[in-house]
Structure formats: structure tokens, C-alpha cells
Amino acid sequence: MANNNRKNIKRLLFGEFSWKRLMRSIIFIYAFLCFYAFFFSEGLIFQPPSSSQNDSREVIKINSANGLKISAIHFPNPQAKYTILYSHGNAEDLDGILWVLREIRDSGFAVFAYDYQGYGTSQGRPSEYNTYRDIDAAYNYLTQQLGVPAKQIIVYGRSVGGGPAIDLASRQSVGGLVVESSFVSAFRVLTQIPILPFDKFVNIDKIGKVRSPVL
């Protein structure tokens, strides 16, 4: 009697088990996951820190491809042969990495770093596509305004910065590429195999197109 009561309660709460019902549930969960990943994933990928940073005389304003201004910093080094084009991590901004940039300069390189749209004092909102625009703007400023030869630019990407760094290096003949703590793709940070019909920062597909030395 007690077993029958338990079965009746389960049937009321969960319904009769069937493979059709199970498949419908799996399809619903998968569709919800796709919807959430497509519309809300960039809010998880990009986490701009709260910053009290103000534009100082060190800060350069450059135009991204969509017309918005992003902030950049250039630490020249007259003795340096190479310039590091630095793309920072998802929870960093220029104000928080100044010490890193100075250490790189003091180790024998010139350094050019920038904030993605929505970071620091850069205008706009961060997105995968906007990071590609932003690194292009930084690269163009280096080569066109500062006259740095492409072969003397080493592109450095840390964490999410590996995405724009790899993307640029796959399209331009730069002097080298350094990738630190990055990922094969954004969604495969959580899953070892691709389970969604789309992805972001698919670095694994681009790294093979890089013809420069990679570290």
C-alpha cells in the first residue's frame, strides 16, 4: 500500500516515465542552453573591473572601427628592437596592469597596450567582435602613426586577450605571438567537446593560420 502511494505521488509530481518524455526534456534543456549562451555569454566572458582610472597624459585615444574611442598606453624603449602589443585579461584594465607593462618595458621591449571597449575609460561595450576591432585599431596606430614595422611587433594575449591576439596574428605578418593562460575556444572552457552549434573566440581554428613564431 505504501509503495503504491509513493508511486502515485511520483506520478503526480513527475508524470509517467517514457523515452519520448525524456527526449523532450533533453531537447528543451539543450534549446535553453543554446538560447542562454547565444544571448548572455558575453556578460560572463567580459567582466570589466570597477575602475577609478582617469585619462592621464599617458593615455592615448584611438578610434576603433565602429567610431568609438578606446584608451591605450605606449611605453617606448629607444633600445628595443621589438614592440609588445599587449591584450589583457577579462577582469583587468590598463590601470591594473601598469606594473606588468613597465616590467615588460624594463626587460628590453617597447610596449603598447589598450583597453577593450567598455573597459577603463574606453567607450562602448565589450564583445568578441569589438575586441577584434580594438586590436586592429591598436595595430594600425602602431604601424601607421608610430611607424613600427609589422615584423617588429610581438602580439601578446593573456586570458581572453588571447582571442584578439590570435585573430590578429592569423591575419597579419607580425614578428611573433605570445599566448598566456588562454583557451581553445570560449565555450570549450566548460566542455571538452563542442556541444553547441556556435562558439566564441574559436582560437583553435585560427592558431594554425599563424605564420609567425608562437610561444
Regions found by a protein language model. Name each.
Residues 125-128, 192-197:
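Short glycine-enriched, charge-decorated loop/helix-capping segments at active-site entrances
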Residues 63-70, 195-200:
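Short gly/ser/thr-rich secondary-structure transition/capping motifs
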Residues 65-141, 145, 151, 163:
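Membrane-embedded segments
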Residues 195-215:
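The feature captures the conserved acid-bearing segment of alpha/beta-hydrolase catalytic domains
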